[in-house]
Regions:
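Amphipathic alpha-helical packing segments from all-alpha helical-bundle domains
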Residues: 125-153, 158-172, 176
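Short hydrophobic clusters on alpha-helical segments that form packing/core surfaces
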Residues: 26-34, 76, 102, 106
Length: 209
């Protein structure tokens, strides 16, 4: 590579870094606006104004308003998956580990996560009919582990996919109640744990019971 090509390549890298930093800054502004105002009051125009950029720039960086919400919730799901990389082997401790991580995440910024998840529901981003959508990604976090069957903790009389769906549903229903303001996070923890453990009990071996 010649000197000129090196300069051009360096310039391209620098521009991409600056673009990513600007995008991250605007993304954080969007998070704050959604947390304070909710979905209905959140607009691309106001986001652009506070960020000091043009509306077309926002569209170029993120797309539509719904795309921003989808990315926010996608990041949340990725965070949940990252938090679950080294879970306990015991199913009960695993369930507690998972639910505690969800609660701890929500506690970091209650207003934002409630607003973002409410927005996602309103925009139907959790519609199970969307191929490879948020619903399917969230379900994968709830999948039972293969070593539970290998250790004889689960009998295998119920399809793992069914257990995954029911565990995810226990978390989802509790989350919807929390987002709607019907329960607090402690009640969410209790509701989600009870639902998950009842699902596990339906296929647990006598020894595990």
């Amino acid at each position: 590579m010649g000197e000129k090509e090196k300069v051009i390549a360096h310039g391209n890298v620098a521009r991409q870094i600056n673009k990513n930093l600007r995008r991250e800054r605007i993304f954080n502004i969007a998070k704050n606006q959604i947390a304070k105002k909710g979905l209905e009051a959140f607009t691309i125009a106001e986001l652009a104004q506070e960020a000091g950029v043009s509306t077309p720039t926002i569209h170029n960086l993120f797309g539509k308003k719904s795309d921003i919400i989808k990315e926010l919730v996608s990041n949340l799901i990725e965070q949940m998956q990252g938090n679950s990389l080294n879970p306990p082997i015991d199913p009960i401790e695993n369930a507690k580990f998972f639910v505690d991580n969800v609660v701890a995440t929500f506690e970091q910024d209650t207003d934002f996560y409630r607003a973002a998840l409410m927005s996602a529901e309103q925009l139907r981003l959790f519609d199970p009919r969307i191929p490879d959508g948020l619903f399917q990604r969230a379900q994968q976090v709830a999948a039972p582990r293969k070593d539970w069957y290998e250790a004889g903790l689960f009998l295998g009389n119920i399809e793992p996919s069914t257990i995954m769906k029911k565990v995810h549903n226990s978390n989802r229903l509790g989350r919807i109640d929390w987002v709607s303001g019907y329960i607090d996070l402690n009640q969410f923890r209790h509701k989600a744990m009870m639902g998950i453990l009842l699902v596990y009990a339906s296929d647990a071996s006598p020894e595990f019971h």
